């Protein structure tokens, strides 16, 4: 007579049932996520173009030390419909391939999202990892991991999967930004495509990647090659919309009229020893839409409240001057509004930065800038 170990059989059956329950639970949770709708509304009677749930994105990017009460005030102050919420990712140094989600920053983001929902604020959320390198002393543009394979494995499993499981799915986040300004990793297009495939397995919302600004000049052929490499990166084929940190360099002037700035967006006046770039920034941006048929979103759009705001917008004080200039900041915002507001391929913008306005927040919009921002998509579209 053959002996059967019924205990082992029961244990195996329990394991099978447990696996089935976990799978069904994951399916139910994923299915309950109400994915936002990205649509292109271009008809003979409508030139609105690309929208999310019928609206252009009018967002505010939060500094990592944002104050929740200030954030809620700024939503009304700037008449925003979206928040770009960062979660700090602790990275030991600029050559590290390891990283971990900062739990305090993650909990802060969760609490903010809960407050938005409790207030019935009807605010969309774009969630994104923010590399906090060497205690915040190094920028993400300096990060160059010593092992790319290890970096992408850890970025997927330690960072993106954590944000999806802890925040994006349970709190029905509108969009997940899988990376920002990672200039030394961006060319790893196969790894990025694999990362996006991994993300959409667990998350059914919109997915984007934010690329950094670029410079081109006909007399600098390497700059043209670098731009074309960026333009043709197939990671952009996988996202729902293309995000750009729009810190483009426009003029060498300390102050400008709005008209001069709008002209510079299509013909950069930046001058190096008598050589002018003549970069057509607007056309180079549109080329991404033409290439990939993905709408363009300014994931960061900001200018310091100083003279020379249009020279190096990513650098709050390039000439180490202390000449505060609220109007120059506002003129920069107005120039971008005039150039991009009515373009159907343009999805919207995110102001850098709101949610905290202490003295070191040189990019927080001035009152003059606030008036410009309020009238951008003031009709709700």
Regions found by a protein language model. Name each.
Residues 37-80:
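Boundary/entry segment of secreted carbohydrate-active catalytic domains
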Residues 57-59, 82-84, 122-126, 174-177, ...:
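Structural preference for beta-strand elements that scaffold enzyme active sites
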Residues 71-77, 85-134, 186-209, 269-281, ...:
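Aromatic-lined substrate-binding rim segments of carbohydrate-active enzymes
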Residues 41-51, 309-381:
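Aromatic-rich peripheral "rim/lid" segments of glycoside hydrolase catalytic domains that contact
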Residues 19-28:
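Bacterial N-terminal signal peptides
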Residues 78-96, 108-185, 306-311, 352-357:
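Substrate-binding cleft and catalytic face of glycoside hydrolase catalytic domains
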Residues 27-41:
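Sec-dependent signal peptide cleavage junction
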Residues 153-165, 171, 178-316:
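Noncatalytic carbohydrate-binding groove/subsite architecture in carbohydrate-active enzymes
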């Amino acid at each position: 007579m053959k002996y059967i170990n019924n205990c082992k059989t029961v244990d195996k059956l329990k394991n099978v049932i447990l696996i089935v329950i976990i799978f069904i639970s994951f399916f139910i949770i994923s299915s309950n996520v109400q994915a936002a709708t990205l649509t292109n509304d271009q008809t003979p009677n409508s030139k609105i173009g690309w929208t999310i749930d019928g609206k252009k994105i009018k967002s505010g990017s939060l500094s990592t030390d944002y104050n929740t009460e200030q954030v809620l005030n700024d939503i009304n102050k700037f008449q925003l419909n979206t928040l770009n919420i960062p979660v700090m990712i602790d990275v030991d140094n600029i050559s590290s391939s390891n990283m971990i989600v900062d739990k305090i920053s993650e909990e802060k983001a969760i609490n903010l999202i809960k407050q938005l929902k409790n207030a019935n604020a009807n605010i969309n959320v774009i969630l994104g990892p923010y590399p906090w390198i060497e205690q915040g002393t190094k920028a993400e543009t300096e990060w160059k991991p010593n092992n790319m394979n290890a970096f992408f494995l850890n970025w997927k499993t330690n960072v993106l999967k954590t944000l999806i499981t802890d925040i994006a799915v349970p709190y029905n986040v509108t969009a997940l930004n899988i990376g920002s300004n990672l200039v030394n990793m961006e060319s790893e297009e196969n790894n990025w495509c694999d990362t996006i495939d991994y993300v959409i397995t667990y998350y059914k919302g919109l997915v984007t990647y934010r690329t950094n600004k670029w410079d081109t000049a006909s007399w600098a052929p390497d700059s043209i090659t670098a731009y074309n490499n960026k333009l043709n990166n197939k990671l952009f084929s996988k996202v729902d919309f293309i995000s750009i940190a729009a810190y483009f360099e426009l003029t060498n002037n300390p102050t400008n009229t709005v008209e001069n700035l709008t002209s510079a967006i299509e013909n950069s006046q930046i001058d190096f020893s008598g050589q002018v770039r003549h970069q057509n920034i607007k056309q180079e941006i549109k080329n991404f839409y033409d290439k990939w048929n993905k709408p363009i979103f300014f994931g960061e759009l900001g200018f310091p409240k100083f003279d020379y705001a249009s020279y190096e917008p990513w650098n709050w004080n390039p000439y180490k001057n202390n000449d505060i200039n609220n109007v120059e900041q506002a003129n920069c915002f107005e120039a971008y509004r005039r150039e991009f507001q009515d373009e159907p391929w343009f999805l919207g913008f995110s102001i850098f930065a709101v949610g905290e306005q202490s003295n070191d927040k040189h990019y927080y919009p001035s009152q003059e800038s606030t008036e410009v921002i309020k009238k951008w998509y003031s009709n709700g579209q």
